[in-house]
Curated annotation (Swiss-Prot):
GO BP term (any one): fructose 1,6-bisphosphate metabolic process
Assigned EC number: 2.7.1.11
Its job: Catalyzes the phosphorylation of D-fructose 6-phosphate to fructose 1,6-bisphosphate by ATP, the first committing step of glycolysis. Negatively regulates the phagocyte oxidative burst in response to bacterial infection by controlling cellular NADPH biosynthesis and NADPH oxidase-derived reactive oxygen species. Upon macrophage activation, drives the metabolic switch toward glycolysis, thus preventing glucose turnover that produces NADPH via pentose phosphate pathway.
Similarity comment: family membership: Belongs to the phosphofructokinase type A (PFKA) family. ATP-dependent PFK group I subfamily. Eukaryotic two domain clade 'E' sub-subfamily.
Isomerase as UniProt keyword: no
Official protein name in the record: ATP-dependent 6-phosphofructokinase, liver type
Cofactor(s) of this protein: Mg(2+)
Keyword hit for Transferase: yes
Assembly: Homo- and heterotetramers. Phosphofructokinase (PFK) enzyme functions as a tetramer composed of different combinations of 3 types of subunits, called PFKM (M), PFKL (L) and PFKP (P). The composition of the PFK tetramer differs according to the tissue type it is present in. The kinetic and regulatory properties of the tetrameric enzyme are dependent on the subunit composition, hence can vary across tissues.
Gene designation: Pfkl
Protein's organism: Mus musculus
Positions with a binding annotation for Mg(2+): D119
Modified residues (N-acetylalanine): A2
Positions annotated to bind substrate: S164, I165, D166, R201, M208, G209, R210, E264, R292, H298, V299, Q300, R301
Residues with PTM Phosphoserine: S377, S775
Length: 780
């Protein structure tokens, strides 16, 4: 779209009415979506109506359809479930029900529907849209509406958002609620692990997901489970023997617990359900292990939404309004979905069709195809799970040895990356060393060989088990080279923040002086600041955002109770404003000051005036985030003094510096998984590179592509040579020159009720669901 069009969009909603409803099973993050749709709708000048109790409210009408204003959706982003209620509705499946629904919508002049729900709810919406014309004719015949009304409201437009914890909708990488459900599952697994270890027990955990094994698959990956049952990949006949053998094996190698994860829809090769009680009895009879079953049930739907779900829902909600405004009678009903970290629009019925194809493939026992149709993120998770589950200590040794170290500040997920890298390295036949305390430890010779079981139980641990330091290699080059020679190290895997990247760059630049540095090197970016070039997401930043978000939720609660209070919260991140921006969106902050988005005293004045105006409404609290290095003069103390004196008599002010609690406790499911995948992919890349550069009995690597940063860029995993990244880096402020998340700031400002230039808004493209988009090239 051209820039001019978007400026027009500012009032393009004028005269339009949008109805929002949540339907089917609830999911965490639905409230954030309702909030975003409502505010974006009001922002573009449309009238917005909240439809209570899903389709039931639509059919019954009356008090169930209420106009919304900006404040109707205040302070709901942190609540689980849906404040407008949801119901599974029989009446809407009949033509009479839909006729009543059409009549109720016309009473309010609503011809735009935003439906947040699962595939059933969205299919229902599409049927409704297709029948709209004939429903109006019928209403005219019955004399309920006039001919002119029917002409004015001749078309119904629909935008769908997929809200379902099962992540069973094809075409979107993540559905609203999935990440939060994984949070609940991991909290339970962490809690169960401690009791299982005390008693040497086996636990069989049953997770939800109907006919989709996504939750089971990802929680098995993120918890290092011993065995997994999912409907898309039933076990081979005779699996009972294999499973018991595997469980016995892990026990004999010193493990004190076994975890078996089973999806509620799990079946065997012949379509017969596998129940958790059957698995339990099997383990007890064959192995005599003390075994317990835990069925997680509706716990998974509950609790506060994770940061990912809040941001995903907010982004999708805004995009849904744009889709409604841009729709014409000829455009198909669309679903707003996520692909990588980009939002896209997909034709609703194409997605529903592929979702049905999965079920059909499973019914017809074409299981490989079912996994492929689930999409690339599912297929990739499955491949990595199989790889890790079937890995064994290699019988044949390769000639290669490599070292793994952590550099920079601790970040959640580092240990998960170390664990999977160590095990992948050992199963490739390499000798793997771990180095304590970063480059300094390498210089002092704190190097030890590591075995398969030395990294057991590391997945869910926060911080860095290897110990980490910020020291760069330059001052210790002689000693480092000496130790690389002593231990005959052919490759380095460096897991850490900006220092890890800068350190490897220094080693590469010293290759001319020291032949020992002509080895393969790979950096896995791991820092809460998300400031490493070569990747969109660093390991640990998801955990940090969630930690900061939980703190801000509590601070907001305190401000709500006190009335007329503004909190100024300082986040970490160095010069990089990622943490402040993303946390700001997740907690509905009024402003977030960051270094990348320069601001002056006029902006601060505007913010204070905006806050004063806000205090005249029913929302008498404010939350302002400030990145620690966003401005050398406008410090947290300065902002506190400014807000306090300008707001005297209207509001009072308090500050909070979050500090190191942002490094997080246990890693979030995203970071455990991301760490595990990066560890595997980096190690496989290192192995391949070592074979490429092995000549005449020695390793000699001096090409630029022998030292890379691995990262997720848009939709693919990419390896970027550190020498090429050098020109993309601002070394003075320790961050990349280009940052993708800056366009999220528009969303932050708009949702906080500021005028924004729509010229900068990037709307999602309409794509199609094809086998190609579902295939996995390099996806995650």
């Amino acid at each position: 779209m051209a820039t001019v069009d978007l400026e027009k969009l500012r009032m393009s909603g004028a005269g339009k009415a949008i109805g929002v409803l949540t339907s089917g099973g609830d999911a965490q993050g639905m409230n954030a979506a309702v909030r975003a749709v409502t505010r974006m709708g009001i922002y573009v000048g449309a009238k917005v109506f909240l439809i209570y109790e899903g389709y039931e409210g639509l059919v019954e009408g009356g008090e169930n359809i209420k106009p919304a204003n900006w404040l109707s959706v205040s302070n709901i982003i942190q609540l689980g479930g849906t404040i407008i209620g949801s119901a599974r509705c029989k009446a809407f499946t009949t033509r009479e029900g839909r006729l009543a629904a059409a009549y109720n919508l016309l009473q309010h002049g609503i011809t735009n529907l935003c439906v947040i729900g699962g595939d059933g709810s969205l299919t229902g919406a599409n049927i409704f849209r297709n029948e709209w014309g004939s429903l109006l004719e019928e209403l005219v015949k019955e004399g309920k509406i006039s001919e002119s009304t029917a002409q004015n409201y001749a078309h119904l437009t629909i935008a769908g958002l997929v809200g379902s914890i099962d992540n069973d909708f094809c075409g979107t990488d993540m559905t609203i609620g999935t990440d939060s459900a994984l949070h609940r599952i991991m909290e339970v697994i962490d809690a169960i692990t401690t009791t299982a270890q005390s008693h040497q027990r086996t636990f069989v955990l049953e997770v939800m997901g109907r006919h989709c094994g996504y939750l089971a698959l990802v929680s098995a990956l993120a918890s290092g489970a011993d065995w997994l049952f999912i409907p898309e990949a039933p076990p081979e006949d005779g699996w009972e023997n294999f499973m018991c053998e595997r469980l016995g094996e892990t026990r004999s190698r010193g493990s004190r617990l076994n975890i078996i994860i089973i999806a509620e829809g799990a079946i065997d090769r012949h379509g017969k359900p596998i129940s958790s009680s059957y698995v339990k009895d099997l383990v007890v009879q064959r192995l005599g292990f003390d075994t317990r079953v835990t069925v997680l049930g509706h716990v998974q739907r509950g609790g506060t939404p994770s940061a990912f779900d809040r941001i995903l829902s907010s982004k999708m909600g805004m995009e849904a309004v744009m889709a409604l405004l841009e729709a014409t009678p000829d455009t198909p009903a669309c679903v707003v979905s996520l692909s990588g970290n980009q939002s896209v629009r997909l034709p609703l019925m194409e997605c529903v069709q592929v979702t049905k194809d999965v079920q059909k493939a499973m019914d017809e026992e074409r299981f490989d195809e079912a996994i492929q149709l689930r999409g690339r993120s599912f297929e990739n998770n499955w491949k990595i799970y199989k790889l890790l589950a079937h890995q064994k200590v290699s019988k044949e040794k390769s000639n290669f040895s490599l070292a793994i170290l952590n550099v920079g500040a601790p970040a959640a997920g580092m240990n998960a990356a170390v664990r999977s890298a160590v095990r992948t390295g050992i199963s490739e036949g390499h000798t793997v060393y771990i180095v304590h305390d970063g480059f300094e430890g390498l210089a002092k010779g704190q190097v030890q060989e590591v075995g398969w079981h030395d990294v057991a139980g590391w997945l869910g641990r926060g911080g860095s088990m290897l110990g980490t330091k910020r020291t760069l290699p330059k001052p210790h080059l002689e000693a480092i080279v000496e130790n690389l020679r002593t231990y005959n190290i052919h490759a380095l895997l460096v897991i850490g923040g900006f220092e890890a990247y800068e350190g490897v760059l220094q080693l590469v630049e010293a290759r001319g002086r020291y032949e020992e540095l002509c080895i393969v090197m790979c950096v896995i970016p791991a820092t809460i600041s998300n400031n490493v070039p070569g990747t969109d997401f660093s390991l640990g930043s998801d955990t940090a955002v969630n930690a900061a978000m939980e703190s801000c939720d509590r601070i907001k609660q305190s401000a709500s109770g006190t009335k007329r209070r503004v909190f100024i919260v300082e986040t970490m991140g160095g010069y990089c404003g990622y943490l402040a921006t993303v946390t700001g969106i997740a907690v509905g902050a009024d402003a977030a000051y960051v270094f990348e988005d320069p601001f002056n005293i006029h902006d601060l004045k505007a913010n204070v005036e905006h806050m004063t105006e806000k205090m005249k409404t029913d929302i008498q609290r404010g939350l302002v985030l400030r990145n620690e290095k966003c401005h050398e003069h406008y410090t947290t103390e300065f902002l506190y003094n400014l807000y306090s004196s300008e707001g005297r008599g209207v509001f009072d002010c308090r500050t909070n510096v979050l500090g190191h609690l942002q490094q997080g406790g246990a890693p979030t499911p995203f970071d455990r998984n991301y760490g595990t995948k990066l560890g595997v992919k980096a190690m496989l890349w290192v192995s391949e590179k070592l074979r490429d550069v092995y000549r005449k009995g020695r390793v000699f690597a001096n090409a630029p592509d022998s030292a890379c940063v691995i990262g997720l860029r848009k939709k693919v995993v990419a390896f970027s040579p550190v020498t090429e990244l050098k020109k993309e880096t601002d070394f003075e402020h320790r961050m990349p020159r280009e940052q993708w998340w800056l366009n999220l700031r528009l969303m932050l400002k708009m949702l906080a009720h500021y005028r924004i230039s729509m010229a900068d808004y990037v709307s999602g493209e309409l794509e199609h669901v094809t086998r190609r988009t579902l295939s996995i090239d390099k996806g995650f």
